[in-house]
């Protein structure tokens, strides 16, 4: 599983998402900032933060909580 958290600089929701991922005990993920990437900005825009599984293409849009994250990870692992 290759998880990516798409986020922005100075984004309070993104900071909250980082706390949620820590509370859900997500072991490893990349943080990708979309601010300076036109392609990512077009794709994610106002949706950030978005948790993305790069292997399956599945995405979990904000708002999410630790339970939703754990369910997302479990569902992704089954696929």
Where are these regions (language model features)?
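Local sequence-structure signature of Cys/Sec-based thiol-disulfide redox active-site neighborhoods
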Residues: 1-23
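Thiol-based oxidoreductase modules, predominantly thioredoxin-like and allied folds used
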Residues: 27-38, 45
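Structural micro-motif
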Residues: 45-52
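Generic recognition of short, well-ordered alpha-helical segments
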Residues: 15-16, 43, 64
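Non-catalytic, surface beta->alpha helical segment in thiol-disulfide oxidoreductase systems
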Residues: 55-79
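Small/polar loops that bind or transfer phosphate-bearing groups
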Residues: 6, 32, 61
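Short beta->alpha linker loops
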Residues: 9, 35-36, 64
